Amino acid sequence: MWKMERNTNNILDIHTHKAEPVSAGKAIINRKLATDALCEGYFYSAGIHPWDLTEFDTERRLECLREQLAEKQLVAVGEAGLDKLAAAPMQLQVAVFKEQVELSEKYELPLIIHCVKAMDELLALRKEIG
């Protein structure tokens, strides 16, 4: 089994919309799925995407995310971030993003960041959060 080491100094872009199917080996899956249906050797990330935010069920979604963090196959938090094209108010996006940053740090998991037209805000948050 491989071990992930915490390294907060590097930024790695793993974003893709056109991934080739995995024919052998291990795969990282980043989408909505039922964790009990996962096969051994498959890993996933979980997060609250800015496009999926509403003011009405945010706490429920955060609670679901907290519960998933105990799963051994969850290897990253995200996609989480800021998106000026999303319908959710920026204030809500920032609050939920901060919560996900805290969770990724608490569980020592990488954070997959989504950022659209909000790089200045994201960098300001990085300075604020540390």
Where are these regions (language model features)?
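Mid-domain alpha/beta scaffold segments of enzyme catalytic cores
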Residues: 1-130
